[in-house]
A protein has these predicted regions:
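Aromatic, loop-rich ligand-recognition surfaces of beta-strand-rich domains
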Residues: 1-39, 73-183
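Predominantly extracellular/luminal regions of secreted and cell-surface proteins
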Residues: 32-73
Length: 183
C-alpha cells in the first residue's frame, strides 16, 4: 500500500441532503496504519460458501473474506467453526459461478488452545465435483494441519464447478477455519 496526495471534493451536508435519497458514509483515515484497501476479487472470494454446520456466532463468509489472520487464535477477524460438533467429519464447500480451473488451495486453521475447545483438525482432504460425484484431487503435497500459517496443497490441475474440503475433527475437540484460498 502506498500513500499519495489526493484531491477530494467536500459537499456540505445541507447540499448533499437534497440531492437524492440514500445513506451518507464518509471516512477519511488520519492514520495510514488503520486504512485498508479492498483486495481484488479471487476465485475464493467470488465463490458461494456452504458448510456442514456453522456455530451461531460464526459465519461461513469468513472463509473467503480475504482477511489474513495474525495467528490461528485470531479473534479480531471473523471465523467459521463447527462448534459444538466434536470428533465429527465435517465439510466446507465453494461453488463457482462457472467451470473454473484450479491447481492449489491453502487453509488457515482456527485453534484456540488455552482458552477454548477448537483445534486444528486430525486430517483433511480436498474433493472436486464431477457431475453428481465428489472425487479426491490428486495432490502432490501432504495435507498440513499446522497452526499460525496457511497450509497449502498443490494438485493436478482440474476444471470444476465446486470443491469440498472434508475435515475429520480431533477426538473430543471441535475446529474451524479462518481463511480458505484457491488458485
Amino acid at each position: 500500500t502506498s500513500l499519495r496526495p489526493t484531491t477530494i471534493t467536500a459537499i456540505p451536508y445541507y447540499a448533499w441532503a437534497h440531492r437524492a435519497v440514500g445513506e451518507m458514509e464518509v471516512w477519511i483515515a488520519r492514520d495510514p496504519s488503520v486504512a485498508q484497501t479492498r483486495a481484488p476479487p479471487t476465485i475464493a472470494s467470488t465463490s458461494r460458501v456452504s458448510a456442514s454446520h456453522v456455530w451461531q456466532a460464526d459465519t461461513p463468509s469468513a472463509l473467503n473474506d480475504q482477511l489474513v489472520p495474525e495467528s490461528s487464535d485470531d479473534h479480531a477477524i471473523p471465523r467459521h467453526t463447527w462448534w459444538d460438533h466434536r470428533s465429527t467429519a465435517e465439510w466446507l464447500q465453494y461453488d463457482f459461478a462457472s467451470p473454473t480451473k484450479i491447481s492449489s488451495v491453502e487453509v488457515y486453521w482456527f485453534d484456540d488452545t488455552g482458552h477454548g475447545q477448537c483445534r486444528v483438525p486430525q486430517s483433511w482432504r480436498l474433493l472436486s465435483r464431477d457431475g453428481d460425484t465428489w472425487t479426491p484431487v490428486e495432490n502432490r503435497d501432504d495435507y498440513g494441519v499446522l497452526k499460525d500459517q496457511f497450509n497449502r496443497i498443490h494438485f493436478t490441475p482440474i476444471e470444476t464447478t465446486a470443491i469440498r474440503l472434508e475435515v475429520q475433527l480431533q477426538p473430543t475437540f471441535s475446529g474451524g477455519v479462518l481463511e480458505w484460498r484457491v488458485e
